[in-house]
Amino acid sequence: MVKNYKELVAWQKGMELVRRVYALTRDFPEVEQYRLVDQLTRAAVSVPSNIAEGFGRTTNKDFAHFVAQARGSLFEVETQLIIAQDLGFVDDVTADIEEIAELGKILNGLIRSLIRGRG
C-alpha cells in the first residue's frame, strides 16, 4: 500500500515531465516567456500537483477526479509541445510524446483502480 504520493509512479513520471519541460523551454524566444512557455510550464506543473492534491483527499472518487485533471493537463502539455515544434522552438518532440503517452496510460490505470475502489 502506498503511504505517500511521492511513491506513486504517476507522480514520479509527472516530476520528470516538469524537469523536461523546463529544460526544453529554457531556450525559447524571449517573446514566448509569457505566452507558450508560461502555458507549458503551468500545465506540466499541474500534472504532479494534481496527483499530490488528489492523494490528500479522503475518497477514491475525489482522488480519481484530480488524477483526471492531471490527465487533462498532460494532454495540454502534449499539444503545446507539438505547437512548439511546429513553430520551430524545439527540434523533435517524438520522445517526449512517447513519454507523455506512457504517463497517460499510467494515469488511466490509476483512475480505473481508484474507481474500482482499490486505490
Which stretches of residues belong to each language-model region?
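Amphipathic alpha-helical assembly/interaction segments
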Residues: 1-119
